[in-house]
């Protein structure tokens, strides 16, 4: 390793202008360092910029997600709903960007196409889509866990004559602003019943002539329970921001919930059902995150809650055949992120809504007229692909990132990511991944956990600059220990039994299948404790030079 380090034009490049990216850029600038942010969109917002479909909103309590308000960056901010809609969330991020004056550090309508680590100079060369190359000491990815949209591999997908689009690329007008898609009198098809589809479907059903929902795998969905935010509640929350922040930091996922200390198997059936009923009626993720402590550890305890929610689905959906198709049979309750819904199940009681089970009759092709399955053809005017994302690592896979010895990140992580603290990977010095694989912000309330992680990264970078270090890379031993621990912790939970977005599945040339978790599931407090220990011990586990 060379002992010299060439001075780059920038201290850091931050990829992404979502809630975590703009905060990281702000912190680096505040510390007196030169930073450039790169954002593919026209403005800040991240997920709230790209996802503008009808029904899009937070599944986190607004006040608990709003780190910029909790931290006093925009203390005057007032939420209008307990679970804010996408337009309100975009206004919130824009207001925070104004307060931090962060846009001057960004280039918008710009993509990073490649990044190459130059070993002799200890810097990154970052190539933009206009072929310009900028150099930086630290490269920081803040692209988000769900930003690389995924279209299904269906024959004829480009042949459709009507309107079609992925849910995260909703149509825009000539100026780039989102335009409403009028479903009135139209035959609409929605492919996918994950969190996005669950939000779109009830809205589309209100005006569509006919709505066809193409479902392969049902999800466990529970009521969001949204309501307006009263002035009295908003004033009370604002007065308690420091306390609220400390509380959410104390929970495993930074949502405002602690698990019940009891085991589901230790409670009588009547007491259990009364508890489930109470949780089901509460707004938000309480039923997932404040239930019995063994929900995701014990199959019997999990089945108690799954059976309860299945009973609710049967009560809400009038057609028993449809109800059964909407009840998951392939994964435990909560082994996938639970979609929060508003009148989702009641939507299937409408005469104009039709559930198409594509596990029984798979989609064969998209035709100019619509969708053809194994047993029917559906003429459509609009097709919405609510088909999700290449999660967590997908956005990085789409950038040609090359570390030491010209090794590509996508090759290094071919069978699953390997990291230290989920923040750096060996072979890719000075490259940080915020809300990335195996760190404490991804299986978490990103609004808070991403902000806390950005603060830690700033501390490490500042420590390096103060001590004359220009190089950081995990030791092989530290990376191996962390990665093995992440995989082991995940495998002990029922999360390992679902094909959720946080599991990467790879088929090897010999036909064998490798499943690797993309997330750290041991809880935010434990994760931050580990990170603090590393920092306190002069960033042990990292090679600094």
UniProtKB/Swiss-Prot annotation:
Keyword terms: FAD, Flavoprotein, Monooxygenase, NADP, Oxidoreductase, Plasmid
Primary enzyme class: oxidoreductase
pH-dependence of activity, as noted: Optimum pH is 9.
Signal peptide: none
Alphabetized Gene3D superfamilies for the sequence: FAD/NAD(P)-binding domain
Pathway the protein contributes to: Terpene metabolism; (R)-camphor degradation
Annotated InterPro entries: FAD-binding_Monooxygenases (IPR050775), FAD/NAD-bd_sf (IPR036188), FAD/NAD-binding_dom (IPR023753)
Binding site for NADP(+): 57-59, 193-199, 216-217, 501
Annotated positions for site Transition state stabilizer: 337
Listed cofactors: FAD
Enzymatic reactions: [(1R)-2,2,3-trimethyl-5-oxocyclopent-3-enyl]acetyl-CoA + NADPH + O2 + H(+) = [(2R)-3,3,4-trimethyl-6-oxo-3,6-dihydro-1H-pyran-2-yl]acetyl-CoA + NADP(+) + H2O
EC number annotated for this UniProt entry: 1.14.13.160
GO-annotated biological processes: (+)-camphor catabolic process
Activity's thermal dependence: Optimum temperature is 20 degrees Celsius.
Domain of life, source organism: Bacteria
Effect of residue 59 to N: Loss of monooxygenase activity
Binding site for FAD: 20, 39, 47-50, 59-60, 65, 112, 446
Reported induction: Induced by (+)-camphor and 2-oxo-delta(3)-4,5,5-trimethylcyclopentenylacetic acid.
GO molecular function, one term: protein homodimerization activity
Cofactor comment: Binds 1 FAD per subunit.
Purpose: Involved in the degradation of (+)-camphor. Catalyzes the lactonization of 2-oxo-delta(3)-4,5, 5-trimethylcyclopentenylacetyl-CoA (OT-CoA), a key intermediate in the metabolism of camphor. 2-Oxocyclopentyl ethyl acetate is also a good substrate, as is 2-oxocyclohexyl ethyl acetate and methyl-substituted cyclohexanones, but free acid is a poor substrate.
Family the entry assigns: Belongs to the FAD-binding monooxygenase family.
Subunit organization: Homodimer.
Official protein name in the record: 2-oxo-Delta(3)-4,5,5-trimethylcyclopentenylacetyl-CoA monooxygenase
Species of the source: Pseudomonas putida (Arthrobacter siderocapsulatus)
